[in-house]
Amino acid sequence: LDFNGGLMMLHYGNLQFTNATQLNDPFDCHPSLIDFSNVPKEACGGWTPEIIEELRRDPFRRTREEAWICSLSKIYDSILMWSYYSKHKGICIGLDMEKVRKSLSHMWGGTMIGCAEVEVQYKDIVEKPDYFRDAKDFFHYQISTKAKAWEHEQEVRLFILNPSPAYMALLPGQNDDKGPIDWKEVRAFPEIGGECFESVYLGINMDVEEKSKIIRVARKLNPDIKIFQMEIDANAFRLNTKLIE
């Protein structure tokens, strides 16, 4: 996360969910991950194969528009991810996933907040399954499959279908001055407990004042949170951590 994103996450104690159509990878959750073209005759029932193909594809198109995703990672020390997400000037936040799951599964304002969790699988597009012939959970496949180019991220996803407006919010700079905002551009920010925030990792190139702000806000959110400074390993191309007392 960059400084501002990390600061807001710690200040409000929430997670950010983004609509699948707004993710930075255009292949993400796309119906084209599944092959609908091999329509068997017995599936037509008097309709043309083209119509059946569209009818079967359409629910997956809607799923992509209705799914909001929170992208997490199993790792905190990827040089590549630190570089392209924040130029080593931001932070990485460690979560206690057992507590996150518990926090996201409760009643709030009469609305059940709950989300599903999937571990991303990385594949080549040529491996896409045949909808009519392969025995797969195609919904799970659509939500959890990404290109092998992303494999280094070791992503774990939380996702919500059609999140409640109660925890939707605009980002700074978003407004309706130029007309209505597309609902898919609005993020969901369900709140989780401070105990869910287990650790914070500070980037190597982080500004000193910004670092102090992060430490102060993190310890206010969870007095027991562990805070680490990322450091360069002098003997290898890797990052080390140093606990800040």
Which residues are covered by each model-predicted region?
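Partner-binding and oligomerization surfaces adjacent to conserved cores of proteins
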Residues: 1-245
